[in-house]
């Protein structure tokens, strides 16, 4: 079964290698075809460029000729205008001379006029008329020639303009063709690059398949060698067994029963000893061969895994390159979208007048009354103090700047001490969500009261609260809790000092000098009410 499976694997590997080779050959043929097409396109591009150069040279020549013709036309126009101006001047001069002569003739006497030779004048007039006629005809001829030349030049100019337009159209067409060819060339180059990558992958896969095929062939050879060696060893063992059987039969026949048995037992012991030795040697050889095979298989697996990792790394690099391209395109698109949005906003919302300044914030509401049990957390503290009268500890607090030592101050100190002990031992205060919801926070800076509430909440969160199974009796605070609480109180005291330097010195309590003392268990209701009133007043003074 194993040999059949290996043969099937070998066949599949051979089929895959053949398929890979066929695909490789087909890709090579396609590559050659694409190369030929690229060469043809390059030749066509060169021809188009040559034609473009010819068209450009012809167009430059045509432009030069047109410029020269235009210059000649301008010169002829200037000459004609000058000739016409001179002719008009001569006509005016002749008219003025005729008028003057007529005036002089009217002033002269009849005798003088008769003496003047009229024939000479007639001859002169005839000559002048002939000269004028000749000059006017000549001018007409020159003008007609110039007009003919102008018409010819204009016709040539029109033809040259038509030729220029045609050449420009051809240039635009050739440029479009060049752009198309360049685009096709880029596409072909990209396809060839991709095909080269595919060919490289196919080569690697084919090498991988060939390596697997070689490894399978080596495994088959090793298995065949081992099988042949095992068959030879088994055949030799059978021959030796047959020989031993024959020898034992001969010995049994020739020697007596006792001696034969002894000899047979001795031979059997020696044979078993040798057989065990050979079996152990054979097992060691088999183990060594198996270790060699395993090591070779592990090496092959390692090489295969390394190749697979190389392929995966290349694919990962390709995907990373594509990802970076996609990210750059996405960034460009986002930038364009943002610009378009800004333009749309500018078009839809024209710039208006500057908005009016915001109204001033409303004044903060007055603080809640201290006697309300729902909004004041100290009332909950005092209720807990009333319920739990088993607590027999007391802290003596020394106030700063205390000039009068009255019983009210002692009660205050006791209340504050008991409150601090409760805070140390983890008394759970009620949430102050109602007061925070009622009072709307303004744009002011955080005051000392807010910082004090936040510090109390942080202390309550950090201090370990007693579980439901713990006894209600007093528990001594741990040194870590005491150090944390002392730090928090020190910070609170510094904040209060900075906020209220000299406004209320009697309310600032030195909380560093804390001492644990026993409190009297029996207290009447009047003392409790005074204690409640004093504690609420102290806390409201410190929080306000």
Curated annotation (Swiss-Prot):
GO terms for cellular component: axon; axonal growth cone; cell leading edge; cytoplasm; filopodium; growth cone; lamellipodium; microtubule associated complex. GO terms for molecular function: actin filament binding. Residues 17-100, 141-184, 259-349, 480-504 form a coiled coil. The lineage of its organism: Eukaryota, Metazoa, Chordata, Craniata, Vertebrata. PANTHER family: SHOOTIN-1. It is found in: Perikaryon; Cell projection, Axon; Cell projection, Growth cone; Cytoplasm, Cytoskeleton. It comes from Danio rerio (Zebrafish). One of its GO terms (biological process) is actin filament bundle retrograde transport. The keyword Cell membrane does not apply. The keyword Lipid biosynthesis does not apply. Residues 499-544 have a biased composition (Polar residues). Belongs to the shootin family. This is Shootin-1. The gene is shtn1. Residues 372-383 have a biased composition (Low complexity). Residues 397-412, 481-497 have a biased composition (Basic and acidic residues). Residues 352-371, 469-479 have a biased composition (Pro residues). InterPro entries: Shootin-1. Involved in the generation of internal asymmetric signals required for neuronal polarization and neurite outgrowth.
């Amino acid at each position: 079964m194993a040999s059949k499976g290996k043969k099937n694997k070998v066949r599949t590997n051979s089929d895959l290698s053949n398929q890979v080779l066929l695909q490789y050959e087909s890709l090579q043929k396609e590559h050659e075809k694409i190369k030929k097409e690229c060469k043809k396109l390059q030749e066509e591009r060169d021809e188009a460029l040559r034609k473009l150069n010819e068209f450009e040279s012809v167009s430059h020549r045509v432009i030069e000729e047109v410029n020269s013709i235009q210059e000649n036309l301008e010169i002829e126009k200037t000459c004609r205008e000058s000739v016409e101006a001179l002719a008009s001047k001569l006509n005016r001069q002749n008219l003025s001379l005729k008028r003057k002569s007529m005036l002089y003739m009217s002033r002269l006497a009849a005798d003088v006029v008769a003496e003047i030779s009229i024939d000479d004048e007639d001859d002169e007039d005839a000559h002048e008329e002939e000269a004028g006629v000749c000059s006017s005809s000549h001018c007409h001829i020159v003008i007609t020639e110039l007009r003919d030349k102008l018409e010819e030049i204009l016709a040539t100019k029109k033809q040259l303009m038509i030729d220029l337009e045609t050449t420009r159209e051809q240039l635009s067409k050739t440029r479009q063709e060049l752009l198309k060819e360049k685009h096709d060339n880029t596409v072909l180059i990209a396809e060839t690059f991709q095909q080269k990558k595919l060919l490289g992958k196919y080569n690697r896969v084919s090498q991988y398949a060939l390596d697997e095929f070689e490894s399978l062939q080596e495994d088959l050879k090793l298995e065949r060698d081992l099988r042949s060696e095992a068959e030879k060893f088994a055949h030799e063992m059978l021959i030796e067994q047959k020989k031993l059987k024959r020898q034992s039969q001969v010995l049994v026949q020739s020697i007596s029963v006792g001696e034969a048995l002894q000899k047979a037992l001795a031979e059997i012991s020696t044979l078993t000893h040798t057989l065990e030795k050979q079996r152990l040697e054979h097992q060691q050889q088999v183990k060594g061969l198996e270790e060699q095979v395993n090591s070779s298989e592990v090496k092959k697996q390692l090489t295969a895994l390394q190749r697979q990792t190389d392929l995966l790394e290349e694919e990962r690099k390709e995907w990373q390159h594509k990802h970076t391209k996609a990210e750059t395109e996405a960034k460009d698109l986002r930038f364009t979208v943002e610009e378009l949005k800004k333009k749309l906003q500018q078009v839809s919302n024209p710039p208006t007048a500057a908005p009016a300044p915001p109204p001033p914030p409303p004044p903060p509401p007055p603080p809640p009354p201290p006697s309300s049990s729902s909004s004041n957390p100290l009332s909950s503290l005092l209720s807990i103090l009333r319920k739990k009268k088993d607590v027999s500890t007391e802290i003596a607090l020394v106030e700063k700047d205390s000039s009068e030592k009255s019983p009210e101050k002692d009660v205050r100190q006791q209340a504050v001490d008991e409150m601090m002990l409760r805070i140390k031992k983890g008394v759970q205060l009620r949430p102050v969500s109602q007061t925070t919801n009622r009072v709307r926070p303004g744009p002011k800076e955080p005051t000392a009261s807010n910082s004090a509430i936040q510090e109390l909440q942080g202390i309550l969160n950090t201090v370990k609260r007693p579980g439901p199974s713990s006894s209600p009796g007093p528990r001594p605070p741990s040194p870590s809790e005491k150090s944390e609480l002392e730090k928090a109180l020190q910070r609170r005291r510094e904040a209060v000092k900075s906020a209220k330097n000299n406004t209320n010195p009697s309310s600032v309590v030195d909380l560093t000098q804390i001492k644990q003392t026993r409190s009297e268990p029996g207290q009447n209701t009047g003392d409790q009410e005074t204690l409640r009133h004093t504690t609420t007043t102290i806390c409201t003074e410190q929080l306000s």
